[in-house]
Amino acid sequence: VPLAVALCLVCWSAPSSAAEPKEATPAAEETKKKAEEKSPDLATDLKVLNQVEKQPAAVQELYKIARGVLSAKPEATYADLAQDAAFQRFCQENRLTHLGGPMLGSLSADGVKVWVRTVKPAKVEVAVDGMAKAFGPVSSTAESDLVAVVPVTGLKPGTRYTYRVLVDGQPIAMPEPAAITMPSDAKAAKTRIAFGTCPHRWGLGNSKQAELIRSRQPAALLAYGDIAVQDRYSHLGLHRADYLMRDCFAAWRSLVCAVPVYVSWDDHDYFGNDLAGIPPGYTDQNRRQVRDVFRSSWINPGCGSGEEGTYFRTRIGPCDVIMLDTRYFRSGKKGSYLGDEQMAWLEKQLLDCKGPFIILSSGTMWSDYVSGGKDSWGKCDPAGRERIFAFIEKHRIPGVLLISGDRHGARGFRIPRPSGYAFYEFEPASLGARTGPKVSDPAWKDVQLFGIDKQYAFGEFEVDPSPADPEVTFRLIDDGGKTIYELKLKRSQLTPPGPDAGK
C-alpha cells in the first residue's frame, strides 16, 4: 500500500518577542540536565509508536527519518525536514504529499477550519461536495511549520458534508470517514461532546477507542492535557517529532478528519512532569517557543484575551466551552495559577455565557481528594479556586460542569460547598489506560461518583436543551462500548442557591 494511502493540526502564530533570558544558576542548570535525561529516546519512541497496533513498515521508516532530522538540534523545524535529502527521496518514492491532517477544528455557526501539514511548501484547498468552488488556496510555508489552515464557510446546520483536500491541485488520500457534520441549531436538538485526557501518545493509536468516539457522532472532542508530546522540555524539534508520531496513527487520522478537536495542555505537553511557568534553567523565550509549536500543531479558535498561554472560549451546539491554561502562567506566587489576566478573562466569560450548560476545563483536578491536590489547585492556589467557585455562586451562574485530568484513571466527584450547593467534577484521564493513584477511598464514599484504573475510557456529555429544565447526561464509556457510569443532571441541580442558602 503506498504510504500516501497509509497516511490516510489551529492557526499558526509567529513567534512572540520574548524577554532577555536570565543567566541560569548552576543549580538550575543541573536540575534542567537531570530532567532532560528523562526525555524518551528513539527506542522508547518506536515502542510507543507500535504499542497498541503495529505500524506499517513505511510509516516506521518515515518516523525514523523524520525523528533523526528533528532531534538533531533543539530548534529543528519541519522546514529543515523538508530540505533533508533522505526525506525528499522517501516522499518521492512513496508519493507522499502531506504529513498530517486533515484535522477539523474551530467550529463556527456556518463552518469549520481544516488543518493540513504538507511535506514541503504548497498550496492547500478544500473541496466540499455540493459547493461550486473549493475553499482556499492557503499556502503552507516554512514560517507556518508547513501548516495550512483552510476556513470552510457557508455550511448549513444539521448537515453532513463529505470533502476532499487538494495539495498543489492534486487530491490527497483521505481517511474513509472524512466528513464535516455541522451541529443542529434546532432548540430541541441533542448534542454530544466527547472529552478526556492522558492518551500519552500511545492512546492516540487505539483504533477501537477512536472508532467508538467517532461512531457516537459527537459534535466535538475536547482533549485537555498529556495528549501527543511526552516530556520534551525546550527541545522544539522533539516536540515536532511527537506531533508527527500523532499523525502517524491511522486511528487518530480517522477520528479528527470527521470530529472537530479542541485542546489545551498539561505538564507533559508543556515541558515535563509537574513543570509549569518558567521551569528552573529555562527562559521566558523557551516558554513562548513551546507555546508556538503547540499552537501550530492544533486548530483552536484563538487565545483568550491576548497572545499569552493557550486558553479560550467557544460554543459547541448549545454548550459554552471554556478551556483554561493551568500551566503557562504559574510563578509560585499566590494567585498565579491562572494569572491575573486569565482570571479576569474567565470571570467575564462566565457572566457572558448564554447556553444552558458551561463546560469548564482544568488540566489538573479541581478537587483535592486524589493525591491531596498535588501539582494542582489545592497545593498551588486554593485561594484562586475559591475565588472561581465563590464567583459562580455569587452570580448564580447555572449549568457549570467541571472537567479535569492529570491523575491517570478516571474519577468523578461532588465538591460540596458551605452553601449546600455542590459542584460536579468529571475526570476521564483514561485515554491511555495508564495506571495512576488510587481510584477510590472509604473517605470519599459520600462524594465520589465513580473510579477506574488501567483501562481505556472516555467521557461524554449528551445535552438535551428541550425540557423546560434542560438536562445533561454524563457517560464514562470504555473502548469496548460499555457504559461504565452514567449520571443525568438537570440545569436546576447545577444552579447555585440564592444568598440566604446555608443560613
PLM features: residue spans?
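Bacterial N-terminal signal peptides
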Residues: 2-12
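A general, composition-driven signal for non-globular sequence regions
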Residues: 9, 16, 26-28
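General secretory precursor processing signal
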Residues: 11-14, 201
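Boundary at the C-terminal end of the N-terminal hydrophobic targeting segment
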Residues: 13-21
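Metal-dependent phosphoester/phosphodiester hydrolase catalytic core
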Residues: 26-503
